[in-house]
Amino acid sequence: MGQKVNPIGLRLGINRTADSRWYADSADFGRLLHEDISIRKAIREKLKQAGISKIIIERPHKKCLITIHTARPGLVIGKKGGDIEVLRKELAKMTSDEVRVNLVEIRKPEIDATLIADDIARQLERRASFRRAMKRSIQSAMRLGAEGVKVVVSGRLGGAEIARTEKYAEGSVPLHTLRADIDYGTAEATTTYGIIGVKVWVYKGEILEHDPMAQDKRLETSGQSRARANTNQRGPASGAQAAGA
């Protein structure tokens, strides 16, 4: 079972928590869910070069707190904070709540599954060898502390007439072990031959305590620090309840 399902979804409530952290009644749930989808899509399209890993959305009373995990916070903030203020105003048009934007800097993008997948996809779009791209990314992740990495690419690889799937892995990736800290990311490479899908699994060790926020705490203590980028007055975020949308 662990080989088939999304490893993040499988571990929700054990050592992971959802990226949408709010509660809503049935009358508002659909609207808020579509707002979340639109916000994430807009951020990823506008900040393609910023190395966006994940976007966390919390909704305390009448507020929308957006936390962007990025490898290049300076690119998001812009000169004197101008770019992030423009982004905040654009996002505010998508929701009726007050929008605040925070940034978290990713100190080691080489072991972030989403960023690895994006990097491989960009290399494939530049006609790089898929084997070389996979091997280089895996070796870089292993060198910087990952205990295991698996990469799968699927499509018309190298312009072949028949689509196929290729896999490459190093180290251990125990997908059945629920206490394992496994990061998972996907990306698509748009080539002249069609779309090539990229999937990446990164194993970073075990989380022994039963705590849905364990991975977030571990990221903060292992080198990922919060970058200041609150574009409005600072307000308490403790009203957000952890829940999955």
From Swiss-Prot:
GO terms for cellular component: cytosolic small ribosomal subunit. Residues 39-107 form the KH type-2 domain. Residues 221-235 have a biased composition (Polar residues). GO terms for biological process: translation. Keywords: Ribonucleoprotein, Ribosomal protein, RNA-binding, rRNA-binding. Residues 216-245 are annotated as: Disordered. GO terms for molecular function: mRNA binding; rRNA binding; structural constituent of ribosome. SUPFAM superfamilies: Prokaryotic type KH domain (KH-domain type II) (SSF54814), Ribosomal protein S3 C-terminal domain (SSF54821). Gene3D superfamilies: 3.30.300.20, Ribosomal protein S3, C-terminal domain. Binds the lower part of the 30S subunit head. Binds mRNA in the 70S ribosome, positioning it for translation. Part of the 30S ribosomal subunit. Forms a tight complex with proteins S10 and S14. PANTHER family: 30S/40S RIBOSOMAL PROTEIN S3 (PTHR11760), SMALL RIBOSOMAL SUBUNIT PROTEIN US3C (PTHR11760:SF19). Belongs to the universal ribosomal protein uS3 family. This is Small ribosomal subunit protein uS3. The lineage of its organism: Bacteria, Pseudomonadati, Pseudomonadota, Alphaproteobacteria, Hyphomonadales. The gene is rpsC.
